[in-house]
Amino acid sequence: MTAYDPQNPFAKILRGEFPCYKVYENDHVLAFLDIMPRCPGHTLVIPKAPARNILDIMPEDFAHVARAAHKIAAASMKAFKADGITVQQFNEPAGGQVVFHLHMHVMPRHNGVALLPPASRKEDGKVLEENAAKLKAALS
């Protein structure tokens, strides 16, 4: 397996070098909106610990990510009046991973509404700000 690259985009977000639409943070994880969402409210949950993917993360660090994803899923149901939630996590190129810092996708779903294709469009910043505010309110 390739070594963790500290110059990946999510590591840069953690260091404050890239901006993000943050919805949740604690000592172990950061959750922020995907700027190319597959649906409104599409959130990424990442560990603060450097980890390329599930094959590279310490189990206790992955547990923090899973707990945060659970919290975001519940808030997403409320904030977006969702009918369900899709949670995805990809590992290595053959497994569909594109950004090589472990992350979980949490996507609120509505009956009969398909997800957009991955990375098909960049969302407007105002829409992302509004969706972040909805999620933050549901988390409080």
Question: What residue ranges belong to the model's regions?
Answer:
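HIT superfamily nucleotide-processing domains
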Residues: M1-S140
